[in-house]
Design a protein with these regions (language model features):
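Short, flexible loop/turn elements at secondary-structure junctions
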Residues: 116-118, 215-217, 328
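Residues forming anionic-ligand binding surfaces in small-molecule and nucleic-acid pockets
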Residues: 105-117
Length: 345
């Protein structure tokens, strides 16, 4: 096992956080918390599983988190067109009035502490693990809240695409029937069509760019044989890196542990949102996946009223402990539900 060797200056600074002199201890603890401030702020968002879905916007003091909604809604596209003009005549007027969405922000907080002996003995390994647990608590909460917002928007839109049965909008039934829980490339193809047709307008109005799915679905992809894909594509799958992002038809596939039978996001859709799996062609489907249009970052917003603040906790000394606590305030919103849909297989 390799142990990291820390400079004497860092060792002395850590030991000072457990110093018997209250003034020395308070100063050292404050400096320790200040040093953690920026790395923790970065780490909280670098390690989330939202994968750049949300546009993060830090609000100025006193600013409101309000966003204008799109003038054009599905089904209304034909009302917003240009006109062929006669040689003489008045240009038609078009009056629009939009709505605004006010996004509520809320505060989340966390804390962690450790025995003073770890500071006295300069046990960086123990204390850094504790700090990673502190950071992971924020990451876990951000992931959960952000994805519940996406899942709620997808459920509210109500568009569910399957590889079995008739396709949305077109009613096509040419796709062969797949076994329940089996992820197929036909599902991606149908989701692409549904995303574009459901966006309204022409083919540039929306497109499927990313799909978030379970590890078992990716396992199905790795098991595709020559009846599913050609040898060249199979080789690309076999030699892909451990954490490389696979693509099918130009759609990026994101493997997530939270999707799959009995997993967190699956349970949220079924239990909290009361969504049940369909039975298509006498086959009851088993899993959900989520498709997003991230071609334009205009729909998924994360207003941040207060970035993560971390402070030392001087009240723990009587208990022979030291620690930190902190909070941040933010919100989540999906402004345009046309950018999200559910896949089921």
């Amino acid at each position: 096992m390799n142990f990291q060797r820390y400079p004497q200056e860092a060792i002395d600074a850590l030991r000072a956080t457990a110093h018997a002199d209250s003034e020395v201890r308070a100063k050292a603890q404050k400096a320790f918390a200040a040093e953690l401030q920026w790395p923790l702020r970065q780490g909280v968002f670098d390690r989330d599983n939202l994968g750049g879905i949300y546009e993060k916007q830090v609000l100025a003091p006193g600013a409101q988190a309000n966003y204008p909604l799109d003038f054009v809604k599905p089904g209304d596209e034909d009302q917003f067109i240009a006109f062929a003009m006669p040689k003489q005549g008045r240009v038609p007027e078009r009056h629009v009035e939009g709505d605004e969405l006010w996004v509520p922000t809320f505060q989340i907080a966390n804390s962690i502490d450790w025995s003073l002996k770890y500071a006295k003995e300069a046990r960086f390994d123990v204390i850094m693990r504790a700090i990673r647990v502190y950071e992971a608590g924020f990451v876990r909460k951000i992931n959960s809240d952000g994805w519940r917002t996406i899942l709620g928007a997808a459920d509210g839109r109500g568009m569910v695409v399957t590889a079995n049965g008739s396709a949305p909008f077109t009613g096509s039934t040419l796709v062969p029937t797949a076994a329940a829980g089996q992820f197929t490339k036909e599902l991606i193809s149908r989701m692409k069509t549904a995303m574009t047709r459901g966006a309204g307008g022409n083919g540039n109005a929306g497109r499927l760019t990313d799909v978030y799915l379970s590890m078992e679905a990716m396992e199905d992809i790795r098991a595709w044989d020559v009846d599913e894909i050609d040898e060249f594509t199979r080789r690309e799958i076999f030699v892909s890196k451990e954490y490389g992002l696979a693509q099918i038809y130009g759609v990026v596939l994101h493997e997530m542990t939270e999707f799959g039978e009995g997993q967190e996001y699956e349970n949220f859709l079924k239990t909290t949102l009361a969504r049940s799996h369909q039975t298509v062609n006498s086959v009851t489907l088993k899993e959900y996946c989520i498709g997003l249009d991230l071609s334009t970052m205009d729909s998924f917003v994360m207003p941040i009223r207060e970035e993560l603040q971390t402070y030392e906790d001087p009240s723990l000394y009587r208990e022979q402990r030291a620690g930190i606590f902190g909070w941040m305030e933010h919100g989540f919103a999906v402004l345009d539900p046309r950018r999200v849909l559910i896949g089921e297989f």
